[in-house]
């Protein structure tokens, strides 16, 4: 179930009706990921971000994609204006991983919140391919992801 309905952030409210089981950023949800040994998908943006709105319409409102994301990850939506520290930490990681950054900032992390993959806006098919490949790595070779996160 989407957990954003009671959030005060305009950005989080924009995503409250998405079929994705979004959670707001909290220590509790990070602890849940660790206890369930489930990967995190953290999506960071802000209410006036053009590409954030495009990604929501093309990807986050799509039931098929939401079903995959809900199965594969614990999904966290972050308003960068509410959590500039989280945005800064993961933007630094995205730049280290990919050489660039921007918003929406999408990060996949191990259950311990260490990032292993980052992207900004991706078209629908690229997004589906990426989350499917990440899921396969998690299923077949989680040790490779853990080694990569330690670098």
Feature map (PLM): residue ranges:
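Replace the tail clause
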Residues: 1-151
């Amino acid at each position: 179930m989407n957990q954003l309905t009671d959030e005060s952030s305009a950005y989080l409210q924009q995503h409250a009706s998405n079929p994705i089981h979004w959670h707001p950023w909290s220590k509790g949800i990070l602890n849940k990921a660790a206890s369930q040994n489930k990967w995190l998908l953290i999506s960071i943006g802000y209410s006036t971000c053009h590409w954030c709105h495009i990604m929501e319409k093309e990807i986050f409102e799509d039931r098929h994609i939401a079903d995959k994301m809900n199965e594969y990850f614990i999904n966290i939506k972050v308003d960068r204006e509410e959590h500039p520290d989280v945005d800064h930490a993961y933007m630094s990681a995205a730049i280290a991983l990919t050489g660039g950054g921007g918003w929406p900032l999408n990060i996949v992390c191990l259950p311990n919140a260490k990032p292993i993959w980052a992207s900004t806006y991706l078209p629908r098919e690229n997004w589906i391919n990426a989350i499917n490949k990440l899921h396969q790595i998690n299923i077949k070779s989680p040790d490779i992801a853990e080694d990569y996160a330690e670098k």
